[in-house]
UniProtKB/Swiss-Prot annotation:
Source organism per UniProt: Atropa belladonna
Enzyme category, top tier: translocase
Biological function: Produces ATP from ADP in the presence of a proton gradient across the membrane. The catalytic sites are hosted primarily by the beta subunits.
GO MF annotations in UniProt: ATP binding; ATP hydrolysis activity; proton-transporting ATP synthase activity, rotational mechanism
Protein's UniProt name: ATP synthase subunit beta, chloroplastic
Gene name of the record: atpB
Quaternary state and interactors: F-type ATPases have 2 components, CF(1) - the catalytic core - and CF(0) - the membrane proton channel. CF(1) has five subunits: alpha(3), beta(3), gamma(1), delta(1), epsilon(1). CF(0) has four main subunits: a(1), b(1), b'(1) and c(9-12).
Domain of life of the organism encoding this protein: Eukaryota
Amino acid sequence: MRINPTTSGSGVSTLEKKNLGRVVQIIGPVLDVAFPPGKMPNIYNALVVQGRDSVGQPINVACEVQQLLGNNRVRAVAMSATDGLTRGMEVIDKGAPISVPVGGATLGRIFNVLGEPVDNLGPVDTSTMSPIHRSAPAFIQLDTKLSIFETGIKVVDLLAPYRRGGKIGLFGGAGVGKTVLIMELINNIAKAHGGVSVFGGVGERTREGNDLYMEMKESGVINEENIAESKVALVYGQMNEPPGARMRVGLTALTMAEYFRDVNEQDVLLFIDNIFRFVQAGSEVSALLGRMPSAVGYQPTLSTEMGSLQERITSTKEGSITSIQAVYVPADDLTDPAPATTFAHLDATTVLSRGLAAKGIYPAVDPLDSTSTMLQPRIVGEEHYETAQRVKQTLQRYKELQDIIAILGLDELSEEDRLLVARARKIERFLSQPFFVAEVFTGSPGKYVGLAETIRGFQLILSGELDGLPEQAFYLVGNIDEATAKAMNLEMESNLKK
Protein backbone atom coordinates (compact mmCIF):
# COMPACT_ATOMS: atom_id res chain seq x y z
CA MET A 1 0.00 0.00 0.00
CA ARG A 2 1.36 3.44 -0.77
CA ILE A 3 0.31 6.80 0.57
CA ASN A 4 -1.60 9.06 -1.83
CA PRO A 5 0.96 10.04 -4.50
CA THR A 6 1.61 13.73 -4.93
CA THR A 7 2.75 15.45 -8.06
CA SER A 8 5.39 18.11 -8.45
CA GLY A 9 4.77 21.26 -10.50
CA SER A 10 5.74 19.46 -13.72
CA GLY A 11 3.01 16.87 -13.16
CA VAL A 12 5.57 14.06 -12.67
CA SER A 13 4.88 11.77 -9.72
CA THR A 14 7.52 12.46 -7.08
CA LEU A 15 7.80 8.71 -6.53
CA GLU A 16 9.47 8.34 -9.95
CA LYS A 17 12.51 10.41 -8.91
CA LYS A 18 13.04 8.98 -5.43
CA ASN A 19 15.04 10.87 -2.84
CA LEU A 20 16.04 8.25 -0.27
CA GLY A 21 17.22 8.69 3.30
CA ARG A 22 17.79 6.51 6.38
CA VAL A 23 16.34 6.59 9.91
CA VAL A 24 19.14 7.48 12.37
CA GLN A 25 17.17 8.10 15.59
CA ILE A 26 13.68 7.36 16.95
CA ILE A 27 12.24 9.03 20.07
CA GLY A 28 8.56 8.09 20.39
CA PRO A 29 6.66 9.75 17.52
CA VAL A 30 9.69 11.83 16.42
CA LEU A 31 12.29 10.51 13.93
CA ASP A 32 15.64 11.85 12.76
CA VAL A 33 16.42 10.98 9.13
CA ALA A 34 19.74 11.40 7.27
CA PHE A 35 19.68 12.27 3.54
CA PRO A 36 22.51 12.46 0.98
CA PRO A 37 24.29 15.87 0.81
CA GLY A 38 22.39 18.41 -1.32
CA LYS A 39 19.16 16.37 -1.24
CA MET A 40 17.53 17.72 1.90
CA PRO A 41 13.70 17.73 1.90
CA ASN A 42 11.85 20.97 2.63
CA ILE A 43 10.04 21.65 5.91
CA TYR A 44 6.50 20.12 5.84
CA ASN A 45 7.47 17.61 3.13
CA ALA A 46 5.90 14.18 3.53
CA LEU A 47 8.27 11.27 4.19
CA VAL A 48 7.40 7.57 4.10
CA VAL A 49 9.33 4.99 6.13
CA GLN A 50 9.21 1.61 4.43
CA GLY A 51 10.54 -1.76 5.53
CA ARG A 52 9.66 -4.82 7.61
CA ASP A 53 9.42 -5.25 11.36
CA SER A 54 11.04 -8.03 13.42
CA VAL A 55 8.30 -10.54 12.48
CA GLY A 56 8.38 -9.69 8.78
CA GLN A 57 5.24 -7.52 8.66
CA PRO A 58 5.45 -4.61 6.17
CA ILE A 59 5.84 -1.14 7.69
CA ASN A 60 4.55 2.00 6.00
CA VAL A 61 4.70 5.07 8.24
CA ALA A 62 4.06 8.58 6.91
CA CYS A 63 5.90 11.47 8.59
CA GLU A 64 6.16 15.23 8.17
CA VAL A 65 9.44 17.18 8.24
CA GLN A 66 9.49 19.69 11.11
CA GLN A 67 13.14 20.76 11.43
CA LEU A 68 16.37 20.80 9.42
CA LEU A 69 19.07 19.88 11.96
CA GLY A 70 22.29 20.29 9.97
CA ASN A 71 24.73 17.48 9.08
CA ASN A 72 22.22 16.42 6.37
CA ARG A 73 19.63 15.41 8.97
CA VAL A 74 15.97 16.32 9.33
CA ARG A 75 13.60 15.79 12.27
CA ALA A 76 10.11 14.55 11.39
CA VAL A 77 6.89 13.76 13.26
CA ALA A 78 5.15 10.43 12.52
CA MET A 79 1.46 10.39 11.55
CA SER A 80 0.95 6.82 12.77
CA ALA A 81 2.47 4.57 15.44
CA THR A 82 6.26 4.10 15.22
CA ASP A 83 6.15 0.54 16.63
CA GLY A 84 8.54 -1.75 14.79
CA LEU A 85 10.68 1.00 13.26
CA THR A 86 14.45 0.53 13.53
CA ARG A 87 17.47 2.65 12.72
CA GLY A 88 18.70 2.22 9.17
CA MET A 89 15.24 1.81 7.62
CA GLU A 90 14.71 3.39 4.21
CA VAL A 91 12.82 6.70 4.02
CA ILE A 92 11.33 8.17 0.82
CA ASP A 93 10.98 11.94 0.47
CA LYS A 94 7.71 12.64 -1.37
CA GLY A 95 8.91 16.11 -2.44
CA ALA A 96 5.64 17.77 -1.38
CA PRO A 97 3.46 18.17 1.74
CA ILE A 98 0.84 15.56 2.72
CA SER A 99 -1.95 15.81 0.12
CA VAL A 100 -5.54 14.68 0.63
CA PRO A 101 -8.52 14.04 -1.69
CA VAL A 102 -10.97 16.94 -2.07
CA GLY A 103 -14.29 17.59 -3.81
CA GLY A 104 -17.75 16.02 -3.90
CA ALA A 105 -16.39 12.46 -3.69
CA THR A 106 -15.39 13.10 -0.05
CA LEU A 107 -19.02 13.59 1.10
CA GLY A 108 -20.43 10.77 3.21
CA ARG A 109 -16.96 9.27 3.77
CA ILE A 110 -14.64 9.02 6.79
CA PHE A 111 -10.93 9.83 6.37
CA ASN A 112 -7.80 9.74 8.48
CA VAL A 113 -5.17 12.49 8.63
CA LEU A 114 -3.55 11.27 5.38
CA GLY A 115 -6.84 11.43 3.47
CA GLU A 116 -7.17 7.64 3.34
CA PRO A 117 -10.77 6.35 3.71
CA VAL A 118 -11.27 4.34 6.91
CA ASP A 119 -14.96 3.38 6.48
CA ASN A 120 -14.44 0.15 4.48
CA LEU A 121 -16.38 1.58 1.52
CA GLY A 122 -13.52 1.28 -0.97
CA PRO A 123 -11.27 3.94 -2.51
CA VAL A 124 -12.38 7.54 -3.03
CA ASP A 125 -13.49 8.27 -6.57
CA THR A 126 -11.42 11.40 -7.21
CA SER A 127 -8.03 12.31 -8.60
CA THR A 128 -8.17 15.86 -7.21
CA MET A 129 -5.69 16.23 -4.35
CA SER A 130 -4.73 19.24 -2.28
CA PRO A 131 -1.78 19.84 0.10
CA ILE A 132 -2.75 20.37 3.76
CA HIS A 133 -0.33 23.30 4.20
CA ARG A 134 -1.49 26.46 2.42
CA SER A 135 -1.24 30.14 3.15
CA ALA A 136 -4.36 32.02 4.32
CA PRO A 137 -6.27 33.97 1.61
CA ALA A 138 -4.71 37.34 0.77
CA PHE A 139 -6.46 40.39 2.19
CA ILE A 140 -7.63 41.45 -1.28
CA GLN A 141 -9.48 38.10 -1.67
CA LEU A 142 -11.43 38.48 1.57
CA ASP A 143 -15.07 39.43 1.74
CA THR A 144 -15.02 42.06 4.49
CA LYS A 145 -18.77 42.70 4.47
CA LEU A 146 -20.28 41.75 7.84
CA SER A 147 -23.28 39.51 7.35
CA ILE A 148 -25.21 37.12 9.57
CA PHE A 149 -25.20 33.42 8.85
CA GLU A 150 -28.83 32.40 9.40
CA THR A 151 -29.11 28.97 11.01
CA GLY A 152 -32.91 28.66 11.35
CA ILE A 153 -32.44 28.03 15.09
CA LYS A 154 -34.31 30.75 17.02
CA VAL A 155 -32.11 31.09 20.10
CA VAL A 156 -28.92 31.32 18.01
CA ASP A 157 -30.21 33.72 15.35
CA LEU A 158 -31.81 36.10 17.85
CA LEU A 159 -29.40 36.22 20.80
CA ALA A 160 -25.96 35.07 19.60
CA PRO A 161 -26.00 35.25 15.77
CA TYR A 162 -23.22 33.60 13.79
CA ARG A 163 -21.09 35.60 11.41
CA ARG A 164 -20.81 34.34 7.84
CA GLY A 165 -17.20 33.18 7.62
CA GLY A 166 -16.81 33.56 11.38
CA LYS A 167 -15.64 31.30 14.15
CA ILE A 168 -17.94 30.14 16.92
CA GLY A 169 -16.93 28.47 20.17
CA LEU A 170 -19.26 25.72 21.42
CA PHE A 171 -19.08 25.17 25.18
CA GLY A 172 -20.91 22.41 26.99
CA GLY A 173 -20.42 19.31 29.09
CA ALA A 174 -21.40 15.74 28.25
CA GLY A 175 -25.03 14.98 27.44
CA VAL A 176 -26.38 18.50 26.95
CA GLY A 177 -26.98 18.20 23.21
CA LYS A 178 -23.75 19.27 21.43
CA THR A 179 -23.96 16.44 18.89
CA VAL A 180 -27.64 17.04 18.06
CA LEU A 181 -27.01 20.79 17.66
CA ILE A 182 -24.06 20.07 15.34
CA MET A 183 -26.17 17.68 13.23
CA GLU A 184 -29.04 20.18 12.99
CA LEU A 185 -26.63 22.88 11.78
CA ILE A 186 -25.25 20.47 9.15
CA ASN A 187 -28.82 19.70 8.03
CA ASN A 188 -29.91 23.36 7.93
CA ILE A 189 -26.88 24.67 5.99
CA ALA A 190 -27.56 22.05 3.32
CA LYS A 191 -31.26 22.98 3.07
CA ALA A 192 -31.12 26.77 3.41
CA HIS A 193 -27.72 27.63 1.93
CA GLY A 194 -27.09 24.71 -0.44
CA GLY A 195 -23.87 24.27 1.50
CA VAL A 196 -21.90 21.30 2.76
CA SER A 197 -20.11 20.52 6.00
CA VAL A 198 -16.80 19.02 7.03
CA PHE A 199 -16.42 17.50 10.50
CA GLY A 200 -12.93 17.28 11.98
CA GLY A 201 -12.73 14.95 14.99
CA VAL A 202 -9.52 16.08 16.67
CA GLY A 203 -8.32 13.97 19.58
CA GLU A 204 -11.73 13.02 20.94
CA ARG A 205 -13.15 9.59 21.83
CA THR A 206 -13.36 7.03 19.02
CA ARG A 207 -16.70 5.83 20.46
CA GLU A 208 -18.15 9.35 20.08
CA GLY A 209 -16.89 9.52 16.50
CA ASN A 210 -18.59 6.20 15.77
CA ASP A 211 -21.82 7.32 17.49
CA LEU A 212 -21.85 10.54 15.45
CA TYR A 213 -21.43 8.57 12.21
CA MET A 214 -24.28 6.19 13.15
CA GLU A 215 -26.58 9.07 14.17
CA MET A 216 -25.81 10.92 10.93
CA LYS A 217 -26.80 7.84 8.92
CA GLU A 218 -29.97 7.45 11.01
CA SER A 219 -31.02 11.08 10.55
CA GLY A 220 -30.23 11.20 6.81
CA VAL A 221 -27.30 13.65 7.00
CA ILE A 222 -25.28 10.78 5.49
CA ASN A 223 -27.27 8.98 2.79
CA GLU A 224 -26.28 5.31 2.73
CA GLU A 225 -28.30 4.47 -0.41
CA ASN A 226 -26.79 7.31 -2.45
CA ILE A 227 -23.57 8.43 -0.78
CA ALA A 228 -23.21 11.41 -3.17
CA GLU A 229 -26.40 12.91 -1.65
CA SER A 230 -24.69 13.16 1.76
CA LYS A 231 -24.13 16.59 3.28
CA VAL A 232 -20.94 16.03 5.26
CA ALA A 233 -17.38 14.67 5.04
CA LEU A 234 -15.80 13.30 8.23
CA VAL A 235 -12.10 13.43 9.12
CA TYR A 236 -11.01 11.65 12.30
CA GLY A 237 -7.75 11.69 14.26
CA GLN A 238 -8.96 10.45 17.62
CA MET A 239 -7.45 10.01 21.10
CA ASN A 240 -5.69 6.74 20.24
CA GLU A 241 -3.71 8.34 17.39
CA PRO A 242 -0.13 9.59 17.89
CA PRO A 243 0.24 13.35 18.47
CA GLY A 244 1.41 13.97 14.89
CA ALA A 245 -1.96 12.83 13.52
CA ARG A 246 -3.95 14.85 16.08
CA MET A 247 -1.84 17.91 15.31
CA ARG A 248 -2.54 17.73 11.57
CA VAL A 249 -6.06 16.27 11.27
CA GLY A 250 -7.59 19.75 11.71
CA LEU A 251 -5.63 20.92 8.66
CA THR A 252 -6.85 17.90 6.64
CA ALA A 253 -10.49 18.81 7.40
CA LEU A 254 -9.82 22.49 6.66
CA THR A 255 -8.22 21.63 3.30
CA MET A 256 -11.35 19.71 2.25
CA ALA A 257 -13.53 22.65 3.34
CA GLU A 258 -11.35 25.15 1.42
CA TYR A 259 -11.94 23.27 -1.83
CA PHE A 260 -15.73 23.53 -1.43
CA ARG A 261 -15.34 27.28 -0.73
CA ASP A 262 -12.76 28.21 -3.39
CA VAL A 263 -13.58 25.87 -6.28
CA ASN A 264 -17.26 24.94 -5.77
CA GLU A 265 -18.01 28.47 -4.41
CA GLN A 266 -20.21 27.10 -1.63
CA ASP A 267 -20.93 28.10 1.95
CA VAL A 268 -19.21 25.54 4.15
CA LEU A 269 -19.59 24.66 7.82
CA LEU A 270 -16.39 23.36 9.40
CA PHE A 271 -16.74 21.62 12.76
CA ILE A 272 -13.66 21.06 14.90
CA ASP A 273 -14.19 18.84 17.94
CA ASN A 274 -12.06 19.64 19.91
CA ILE A 275 -9.81 22.65 19.27
CA PHE A 276 -8.08 22.16 22.65
CA ARG A 277 -6.82 18.72 21.52
CA PHE A 278 -5.11 20.39 18.53
CA VAL A 279 -3.11 22.54 20.97
CA GLN A 280 -2.51 19.57 23.28
CA ALA A 281 -1.04 17.47 20.43
CA GLY A 282 1.28 20.34 19.49
CA SER A 283 2.45 20.54 23.07
CA GLU A 284 3.16 16.78 23.15
CA VAL A 285 5.57 16.90 20.19
CA SER A 286 7.05 20.32 21.02
CA ALA A 287 9.37 19.05 23.76
CA LEU A 288 10.44 16.07 21.62
CA LEU A 289 11.39 18.54 18.88
CA GLY A 290 13.71 20.21 21.38
CA ARG A 291 11.73 23.41 21.94
CA MET A 292 11.73 25.13 25.32
CA PRO A 293 8.29 24.90 26.95
CA SER A 294 6.38 28.13 27.50
CA ALA A 295 3.67 29.02 30.07
CA VAL A 296 2.04 26.00 31.79
CA GLY A 297 4.23 23.69 29.69
CA TYR A 298 2.64 24.62 26.35
CA GLN A 299 4.66 24.97 23.16
CA PRO A 300 6.32 28.38 22.58
CA THR A 301 4.73 28.42 19.09
CA LEU A 302 1.15 28.15 20.48
CA SER A 303 -0.14 31.46 19.06
CA THR A 304 1.51 30.87 15.67
CA GLU A 305 0.09 27.35 15.30
CA MET A 306 -3.39 28.49 16.30
CA GLY A 307 -3.19 31.51 13.98
CA SER A 308 -2.07 29.48 10.95
CA LEU A 309 -5.18 27.27 11.34
CA GLN A 310 -7.69 30.00 12.24
CA GLU A 311 -6.63 32.54 9.59
CA ARG A 312 -7.48 30.07 6.81
CA ILE A 313 -11.07 29.91 8.12
CA THR A 314 -12.71 32.96 6.55
CA SER A 315 -15.05 34.40 3.90
CA THR A 316 -13.66 35.10 0.45
CA LYS A 317 -15.37 36.56 -2.61
CA GLU A 318 -16.02 32.95 -3.77
CA GLY A 319 -17.69 31.51 -0.66
CA SER A 320 -17.33 31.17 3.08
CA ILE A 321 -16.12 28.77 5.74
CA THR A 322 -18.02 29.25 8.98
CA SER A 323 -16.37 27.27 11.74
CA ILE A 324 -17.93 25.87 14.90
CA GLN A 325 -15.32 24.70 17.36
CA ALA A 326 -15.97 22.76 20.53
CA VAL A 327 -13.74 24.21 23.24
CA TYR A 328 -12.65 22.09 26.20
CA VAL A 329 -11.61 24.27 29.13
CA PRO A 330 -9.07 22.37 31.28
CA ALA A 331 -10.07 22.45 34.96
CA ASP A 332 -12.64 25.15 34.03
CA ASP A 333 -9.77 27.67 33.96
CA LEU A 334 -10.57 30.22 31.26
CA THR A 335 -7.13 31.84 31.71
CA ASP A 336 -5.31 28.64 30.65
CA PRO A 337 -3.17 29.54 27.57
CA ALA A 338 -5.00 27.04 25.28
CA PRO A 339 -8.60 28.36 25.66
CA ALA A 340 -7.33 31.94 26.12
CA THR A 341 -5.54 31.78 22.73
CA THR A 342 -8.69 30.30 21.14
CA PHE A 343 -10.96 33.09 22.49
CA ALA A 344 -8.93 35.72 20.62
CA HIS A 345 -10.15 34.22 17.32
CA LEU A 346 -13.86 33.68 18.15
CA ASP A 347 -16.71 35.88 16.84
CA ALA A 348 -19.43 34.21 18.92
CA THR A 349 -19.88 31.71 21.72
CA THR A 350 -22.72 29.21 22.11
CA VAL A 351 -22.91 27.96 25.70
CA LEU A 352 -25.03 24.87 26.42
CA SER A 353 -26.60 24.73 29.88
CA ARG A 354 -27.21 21.58 31.90
CA GLY A 355 -29.99 23.39 33.80
CA LEU A 356 -31.98 24.01 30.60
CA ALA A 357 -31.38 20.43 29.40
CA ALA A 358 -32.71 19.16 32.73
CA LYS A 359 -35.89 21.24 32.19
CA GLY A 360 -36.30 19.60 28.77
CA ILE A 361 -35.67 22.84 26.87
CA TYR A 362 -33.80 21.90 23.70
CA PRO A 363 -31.61 23.24 22.18
CA ALA A 364 -30.22 23.89 25.68
CA VAL A 365 -28.43 27.09 24.59
CA ASP A 366 -27.99 29.47 27.53
CA PRO A 367 -29.52 32.77 26.33
CA LEU A 368 -27.63 34.88 28.90
CA ASP A 369 -24.17 33.26 28.68
CA SER A 370 -23.99 32.97 24.87
CA THR A 371 -22.45 36.00 23.16
CA SER A 372 -21.78 37.36 19.68
CA THR A 373 -19.82 40.30 18.28
CA MET A 374 -22.49 40.51 15.56
CA LEU A 375 -25.23 41.65 17.97
CA GLN A 376 -24.79 45.36 17.24
CA PRO A 377 -27.47 47.70 15.82
CA ARG A 378 -25.28 48.73 12.85
CA ILE A 379 -24.94 45.07 11.79
CA VAL A 380 -28.24 43.39 12.67
CA GLY A 381 -30.44 46.51 12.62
CA GLU A 382 -32.23 48.37 15.42
CA GLU A 383 -35.29 46.08 15.49
CA HIS A 384 -33.31 42.86 15.96
CA TYR A 385 -30.95 44.46 18.51
CA GLU A 386 -33.77 45.98 20.60
CA THR A 387 -35.75 42.72 20.63
CA ALA A 388 -32.68 40.69 21.67
CA GLN A 389 -31.81 43.13 24.46
CA ARG A 390 -35.39 43.13 25.83
CA VAL A 391 -35.47 39.32 25.77
CA LYS A 392 -32.17 39.21 27.69
CA GLN A 393 -33.36 41.82 30.22
CA THR A 394 -36.59 39.88 30.84
CA LEU A 395 -34.71 36.59 31.33
CA GLN A 396 -32.10 38.27 33.57
CA ARG A 397 -34.81 39.75 35.82
CA TYR A 398 -36.52 36.34 35.99
CA LYS A 399 -33.20 34.79 37.03
CA GLU A 400 -32.83 37.40 39.81
CA LEU A 401 -36.38 36.69 41.06
CA GLN A 402 -35.98 32.90 41.14
CA ASP A 403 -34.56 32.84 44.70
CA ILE A 404 -37.52 34.88 45.98
CA ILE A 405 -39.97 32.62 44.13
CA ALA A 406 -38.29 29.49 45.57
CA ILE A 407 -38.56 30.79 49.16
CA LEU A 408 -41.76 32.84 49.22
CA GLY A 409 -43.68 31.72 46.13
CA LEU A 410 -45.07 33.67 43.18
CA ASP A 411 -47.84 35.31 45.22
CA GLU A 412 -45.36 37.48 47.15
CA LEU A 413 -44.19 39.23 43.95
CA SER A 414 -45.57 42.56 42.77
CA GLU A 415 -48.13 42.54 39.94
CA GLU A 416 -45.49 43.89 37.55
CA ASP A 417 -42.97 41.18 38.48
CA ARG A 418 -45.58 38.42 38.18
CA LEU A 419 -46.37 39.57 34.65
CA LEU A 420 -42.65 39.68 33.82
CA VAL A 421 -42.13 36.14 35.17
CA ALA A 422 -45.06 34.84 33.08
CA ARG A 423 -43.56 36.40 29.93
CA ALA A 424 -40.05 35.16 30.78
CA ARG A 425 -41.34 31.59 31.14
CA LYS A 426 -43.06 31.89 27.73
CA ILE A 427 -39.84 33.26 26.21
CA GLU A 428 -37.82 30.42 27.77
CA ARG A 429 -40.16 27.84 26.24
CA PHE A 430 -40.37 29.66 22.90
CA LEU A 431 -36.56 29.48 22.67
CA SER A 432 -36.97 25.69 22.40
CA GLN A 433 -37.51 24.22 18.95
CA PRO A 434 -38.13 20.80 17.34
CA PHE A 435 -35.12 19.66 15.27
CA PHE A 436 -35.19 17.86 11.91
CA VAL A 437 -32.45 15.44 13.00
CA ALA A 438 -34.35 14.60 16.21
CA GLU A 439 -37.61 13.69 14.39
CA VAL A 440 -36.58 10.03 14.60
CA PHE A 441 -36.51 10.24 18.42
CA THR A 442 -39.22 12.81 19.25
CA GLY A 443 -41.81 12.10 16.57
CA SER A 444 -42.47 15.83 16.09
CA PRO A 445 -41.47 17.33 12.71
CA GLY A 446 -38.45 19.66 12.65
CA LYS A 447 -38.86 23.41 12.10
CA TYR A 448 -36.62 25.94 10.35
CA VAL A 449 -37.54 29.46 11.55
CA GLY A 450 -36.40 32.47 9.52
CA LEU A 451 -34.91 35.45 11.36
CA ALA A 452 -37.81 37.82 10.58
CA GLU A 453 -40.32 35.26 11.96
CA THR A 454 -38.18 34.80 15.08
CA ILE A 455 -38.06 38.56 15.79
CA ARG A 456 -41.82 38.91 15.20
CA GLY A 457 -42.58 36.07 17.63
CA PHE A 458 -40.55 37.51 20.50
CA GLN A 459 -41.93 41.02 19.90
CA LEU A 460 -45.48 39.66 20.28
CA ILE A 461 -44.60 37.95 23.58
CA LEU A 462 -42.84 41.07 24.93
CA SER A 463 -45.70 43.38 23.88
CA GLY A 464 -48.16 41.40 26.03
CA GLU A 465 -50.44 40.44 23.12
CA LEU A 466 -50.06 36.76 24.02
CA ASP A 467 -50.36 37.07 27.82
CA GLY A 468 -53.60 35.07 27.75
CA LEU A 469 -52.04 31.94 26.18
CA PRO A 470 -50.80 29.07 28.39
CA GLU A 471 -47.01 28.73 28.57
CA GLN A 472 -47.01 25.11 27.35
CA ALA A 473 -48.31 26.40 23.98
CA PHE A 474 -44.86 27.94 23.37
CA TYR A 475 -42.90 24.74 24.08
CA LEU A 476 -41.24 23.00 21.11
CA VAL A 477 -42.93 24.96 18.32
CA GLY A 478 -41.52 26.74 15.26
CA ASN A 479 -42.88 30.25 14.67
CA ILE A 480 -45.37 32.17 16.83
CA ASP A 481 -48.38 31.22 14.67
CA GLU A 482 -47.79 27.58 15.63
CA ALA A 483 -47.84 28.62 19.30
CA THR A 484 -51.26 30.30 18.94
CA ALA A 485 -52.58 27.27 17.01
CA LYS A 486 -51.22 24.96 19.74
CA ALA A 487 -52.96 27.11 22.40
CA MET A 488 -56.30 26.71 20.57
CA ASN A 489 -55.78 22.93 20.37
CA LEU A 490 -54.97 22.77 24.09
CA GLU A 491 -58.13 24.75 24.87
CA MET A 492 -60.26 22.45 22.70
CA GLU A 493 -58.74 19.38 24.38
CA SER A 494 -59.45 20.75 27.86
CA ASN A 495 -63.05 21.61 26.85
CA LEU A 496 -63.57 18.07 25.53
CA LYS A 497 -62.29 16.62 28.83
CA LYS A 498 -64.85 18.71 30.70
